[in-house]
Swiss-Prot record:
Database matches in PROSITE patterns: YEATS (PS51037)
Identification of the protein by name: Protein AF-9 homolog
Misc remark: Present with 259 molecules/cell in log phase SD medium.
Domain notes: The coiled-coil domain is required for assembly into the NuA4 complex.
Subcellular location field: Cytoplasm; Nucleus
């Protein structure tokens, strides 16, 4: 029997932070049982609390839709931890559906994550001269690759019963500084802003250089045509 839904609380919004993404590591000669010979990586896809705290009080289950080449590609995880581990050789988009507890009476949250298996470089500010540097963020050839995103689920005008459930646990505020145990922080947020600003500056510089080349080309053509 479905629970009785209480009335919604107007003009109120409640947010709860999550992280989602995947980790991956290249396998050596020893592979898990039943892993196909062509598979090169062991990976885990997940939805978690930022500090690995319990999120099952408002999330009922998480469904991951893998590539169709996997046996039973639709995997439903109905208890924490909301994650699954597989092997593979290629990157692909994973559809993630988050189902909330029945009391929420909320629609399914539907989004995608691009499974990342290979290391990549991130431009980060150079503290000496402000120029960008390349870093692999520990994603070196033999290290574990991590592709993880921080987000907030916003519940607009939750019903009274679900509001009580949400308020039964404290909201998680971002700490000021990141640590080995707590990466997601205002410091990390600022670093991401800095990376975006570096990218914008680089693009603006390239645009200006191309404009100058175009102006010089037009002037040269005018001289040659006179």
């Amino acid at each position: 029997m479905a629970p009785t839904i209480s009335k919604r609380i107007k003009t109120l919004s409640v947010s709860r932070p999550i992280i989602y993404g995947n980790t991956a590591k290249k396998m050596g000669s020893v592979k898990p049982p039943n892993a196909p010979a062509e598979h090169t990586h062991l990976w885990t896809i997940f939805v978690r609390g930022p500090q690995n705290e319990d999120i099952s009080y408002f999330i009922k289950k998480v469904v991951f839709k893998l590539h169709d080449t996997y046996p039973n590609p639709v995997r439903s995880i109905e208890a924490p931890p909301f994650e699954l581990t597989e092997t593979g050789w290629g990157e692909f988009d994973i559809n993630i559906k988050v189902y909330f507890v029945e009391e929420a009476n909320e629609k399914v949250l539907n989004f995608y994550h691009r499974l990342r298996l290979h290391p990549y470089a991130n431009p980060v500010p150079n503290s000496d001269n402000g120029n960008e540097q390349n870093t692999t963020d520990h994603n070196s050839k033999d290290a574990e690759v991590s592709s993880v995103y921080f987000d907030e689920i916003v519940f607009n005008e939750p019903n009274e019963e679900f509001f009580k459930i949400l308020m039964s646990r404290p909201g998680n505020l971002l700490p000021s500084n990141k640590t080995d145990d707590c990466v997601y922080s205002k410091q990390l947020e600022q670093e991401e802003i800095d990376r975006i600003e570096i990218g914008i500056e680089k693009v603006d510089k390239e645009i200006d250089e191309l404009k100058q080349k175009l102006e010089n080309l037009v002037k040269q053509e005018a001289i040659n045509g006179s």
